[in-house]
Amino acid sequence: MAYRFIKWFEELRKEDVPLVGGKGANLGEMTNAGIPVPPGFCVTAEAYKYFVENVKISKEDVKRILGEKANKGTIAEVLAQAPDEPRPLQEWIMDIINRTNVDDSKQLQENTAVIRELIKSLDMPAEIADEIKQAYKELSQRFGKDEIYVAVRSSATAEDLPEASFAGQQETYLDVLGADDVIDKVKRCWASLWTARATFYRAKQGFDHSKVYLSAVVQKMVNSEKSGVMFTANPVTNNRNEIMINASWGLGEAVVSGAVTPDEYIVEKGTWKIKEKVIAKKEVMVIRNPETGKGTVTVKVAEYLGPEWVEKQVLTDEQIIEVAKMGQKIEEHYGWPQDIEWAYDKDDGKLYIVQSRPVTTLKETTTEEVEEVEEAEVILKGLGASPGIGAGRVVVIFDASEIDKVKEGDVLVTTMTNPDMVPAMKRAAAIITDEGGRTSHAAIVSRELGIPAVVGTKEATKKLKTGDYVTVDGTRGLVYKGIVKSLVEKKKKEEAAAAPGAAVAAAPLVTGTLVKVNVSMPEVAERAAATGADGVGLLRAEHMILSIGQHPVKFIKEGKEEELVEKLAEGIEKVAAAFYPRPVWYRTLDAPTNEFREMPGGEDEPEERNPMLGWRGIRRGLDQPELLRAEFKAIKKVVEKGYNNIGVMLPLVSHPEQIRKAKEIARSVGLEPHKDVAWGIMIEVPAAAIIIEDLIKEGIDFVSFGTNDLTQYTLAIDRDNERVAKLYDETHPAVLKLIKHVIKVCKRYGVETSICGQAGSDPKMARILVRLGIDSISANPDAVQLIRQVVAQEERKLMLEAARKRLFEEEEEEEEFLF
């Protein structure tokens, strides 16, 4: 049967996120890599889209489904103004959402519940239902049965909404049996796109509700005898030579949800020596519901298996090593440490991989940090998003209007953070959120700021009150009642040990290709410098300028130019000082119009259909020279203090004249390019790559590839467009040919080459760039060490290949001489 709405795992790759979401794409990737993944298929995002756009309902249908609820609140308003003829479900959904104040939790709960009820109550179109039934039948027949147990999981597809950000927001259904039950669970997955939490998150992050879709993964259920999670790099010590395995009895939900304390095993890569075992008391386990034959229940291990199983080692030593080796295989495939869910099936005794995602929380921490604190009371558990210990007075806030309540050293507690809360986050001793995952805003910013954070606690804003005192363990994801002195003392010792000059770190790898770091905020300069990076390949201006809280041009027009200059100079100096004498490349302002428009005073910003192709970068800088002039004045102030390690980097350059005019503005404030500062450009526009020789002749010292934009512009692909995002590929031959051409020409003229796009943090891309002869690679702070290792390995390979080639040539010459 030719399917329109179904994709089998075998048909999918990791690039298919827009089609089947992160979970689905990853399962397809692993299946095709030969990893033992239970087979299955995905009901594509197109099916959800077809459902909401083609199922039409009338006023009477809505009233029949909702009953008394139809006469209350927002839905009553929608019904009163709706036309009499039936219309697509999507229009009903958007009418309800557009009338919803997401900050009114009661209204948000009520309105999203109405949407979910409508989705669950309506019949699935026959064209979709028939395909699901047929695919389920085919899957069952693979195992010689009419029906098999499956898991049905939600998989969000909007590429710019990280999968982890949806943790606990969309649904997962286990031990589903029968085609009709599968169809029901797929609809329930669709409905879970409209939970209050997921809706609030999208609204606060500025995502368009109408463009977020959901895929449903239908996968053969592993009848787990034992299961768990493994990290292919020790997330506590950041040791990439160790694998950490957590294991418990039954289905893996107990481990993932934190309902059980699992066994923990530490395995050394390569030698496969089991370095450590911690056998836990496993009080509960999740199993298939024995009464209904469907779904799951949580039972006590002592009652279900027997008292002796509570403290029994879950995995045999042979199984520990088997799991660890499988983890290493998956890590090698992806080129990055992985967080993997695994299970042993009691029916065939085999190991299966259920899910894998990149580890995002690796940090340098001390082993002391995770010692048990027996006397302390744990009052909340969540995801350890940013390691370390923080303690202080709790301040609960619900939106950015309350950030002034958070004082220096407070513990910030909120539903979820957003960019407007960054000023408060900087002041906080620790951060706790109800929602979010390891790639949520709270997690990313906390890691960059070096502030301990626990996210996804679900109930922090309910359990904690302003004025409470807590201690936050951002490594283990725990929140303790009160100030735990032993943990706070350990933190002080750690800070003392980490202070500049307090200890001599292990000698870093020395590489011919420099490894630099990207810095978004001056506040993280010291931490970024501590990575051992060879300089800053990208210091972003956006955060410093946007943090003034007002449109910068309006700020200048109000006579506050000096204030802006001081603010910028302060930030630039902080980074230049932390890295001196290592180079710091400052990129001039590159914020698109939509970011400016959201600021106070930004009402006159133009409405652009695609701001990334619009008025930004050097284009805007030359049109509004007062802003560029303020940036150059700030740099001059820092240079006059003796910091001669600064470079100016112009974004979105496409013509030599832009370089010439920018230099004129710099000279007008007394800043001399090439003498006071190094002068460079971003290579983001294909035009810049093609005419690189002309740009060099205008006078530049360095170039840096902005691969995010370069890839989009070269391939004519909008990464935010789910229909074409799967075609986005930074390693596309056309992109690599442009990069290779620029590097070749720059070497001829002695111009330094670098990269500061997201690709700089990708091990695969780093290997390619080393072979192309790039001079430096700038990575995100948490990727610097990994990229340095990758660079060192690739350079050694190149030297070995060259030596072997020379040896073979000498042997051939010797043979010719002898014979």
Curated annotation (Swiss-Prot):
It catalyses: pyruvate + ATP + H2O = phosphoenolpyruvate + AMP + phosphate + 2 H(+). GO terms for molecular function: ATP binding; metal ion binding; pyruvate, water dikinase activity. PROSITE patterns: PEP_ENZYMES_2, PEP_ENZYMES_PHOS_SITE. The active site is at 441 (tele-phosphohistidine intermediate), 756 (proton donor). Pathway: Carbohydrate biosynthesis; gluconeogenesis. Its cofactor is Mg(2+). Catalyzes the phosphorylation of pyruvate to phosphoenolpyruvate. The reaction takes place in three steps, mediated by a phosphocarrier histidine residue located on the surface of the central domain. The two first partial reactions are catalyzed at an active site located on the N-terminal domain, and the third partial reaction is catalyzed at an active site located on the C-terminal domain. For catalytic turnover, the central domain swivels from the concave surface of the N-terminal domain to that of the C-terminal domain. The N-terminal domain contains the ATP/Pi binding site, the central domain the pyrophosphate/phosphate carrier histidine, and the C-terminal domain the pyruvate binding site. This is Probable phosphoenolpyruvate synthase.
